[in-house]
């Protein structure tokens, strides 16, 4: 912790910042480029004519920690780099040290009015506590941490939501001088002490350290919300204001366009499909801007689960913060990574149940606060909704929830709190040591491993080389049986079909993630589907409405005429050039080769049938959109839209997710028909598959959603049924007397297959 403090003090200044309200803040004079509503001078880099970038979210810069690392969407067959991997900035270090004699506090005088960050004149004044005067209190109870985290004592009142608050002069606890800042920076020996009664009238963050013999003790950080009404979880971020928001130096800012080593893609020629023009300093993606830096800053995070009704913060932690994304960095609201897995921040692991979809998961080394990527201008939940449809399948995805973010007390609107996709993701969700596997970023035939500490692409490179060069034709192919020890074929099949259903044009030569190796068969992760569900403007050469996804991935079944434009090349060049085409590089090639095998082809089709029957349905999309949007009350949407106006001519703002639901109306039938044509499938027949007793049945390796399951399959595609006993039970056979395990059956209408367990 001392190491962090020394570094931070070397860059931090102290001041008391003033601001007025949602439409005019302390950011006005410091960072007039970052953006607010049109009536404000706050962060005014974004003009009224703002457009979305053509590609996808979460691209990375250089790697240092355990994150997928890439500073560019390299060699991806799209018109411009996709927003598709996760940033892994390097942490800054300094050997600067502190030396200053202890100073005596100044004498107190009359109360001081502090107007730090934000007034809530436009917000309802429903608050959780009445006017309060506090002299000294302990830190609020911090829970859910690993053993090496020790809650800090605080001479400040507890952070939280107040109607008003008065702070009395602070009493040193160790015989030194308590010095404080109000701009998110760490206190230095030049920071002012609080020596007189102070009335907190607006949102304020205070950081204080007691200096003893010139050395700063632990810093305490408290965020106070005055007359705030927030009905969503709140994430309060405290970060050095200058380093984050200064118009010249701040990470969030465009700056003077001197960011080195990246180049300004905004000056590229060619078919870039630029759609976003919110920044008057440079065109999208403006790679020379500060927000493309891989720098990481220290940040303090406070979390209030129930918004302004939270009596005290649920947890707080020191971490690092960095800007993430690829083209979505150009958006006025940025995505950031919060990373705790660094010795400099003192805390290794946050133990808290962040996601209701998996409450038992309580170990996080990092998370993202996402601006909804390339869908920033269109909706709140598109990517999160699509990928969450994979819950219960063999495909992993990043869990998420919507939260409201404040920087140094300043309202920054709704963000998607999202699992971070790196090796720690596997440790969090599976309990597998993160260093024993590899998370691979797959861009065509280019592979990149997440993190350091032995991270390697070797296993996946060998897998790809093997699959792309092997003849898998025929039944009972030994080579196919061998590859199943290296590739989770159910995960791969379900993943590929789900992305086809999503109609994601920025895939499969981009936005592909898989983890495994070292004895773990590679499993795939649904990731960054921003360009799915009819997103426009989309990828050049990709028809957002009519593109046949089997042609896009595998190449046209017959020679076809494309629609021109290089785009993502579709299935090789054929998707966009009208030539006879082959499979797209990378996963498309793998799928094409594996489909040569009779067993895998049967598995792919039957897994797809189960997905279309239970997971990728109109009803499922409708209910998922409704449940997700229910977590974002209309009052919160209105406030976010006022803070970040969605006024781009190239996009249609869909705050309720209605367009997502409408797109799903006929999507299942459309992709099913494409599959029928690709594989010459015949009539659909309804089959019931049941388990009697303590056990379950797998259909071509895929678990069923219920023990008595009815699904439509194709009459000319066999089913492989495998009975799996559970909890000491024994499989005794099928109800028709058959005892095969597994069992191959030809489906006919009205059939029932019941496995008996005793």
Cite the ranges covered by each PLM segment.
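Short, compositionally stereotyped local motifs that mark structural "simplifiers"
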Residues: 135-136, 140-305, 312-317, 677-758
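Short secondary-structure subsegments characteristic of cysteine-rich extracellular domains
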Residues: 13, 191-210, 618-635
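Sec-dependent bacterial lipoprotein signal peptides
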Residues: 1-17
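Middle-to-C-terminal accessory/interaction subdomains
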Residues: 233-238, 242-277, 288-291, 300, ...
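Conserved ATP-binding subdomain of kinase catalytic cores across diverse folds
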Residues: 280-449
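Bacterial Sec-dependent N-terminal signal peptides
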Residues: 15-59, 64-68, 72, 77, ...
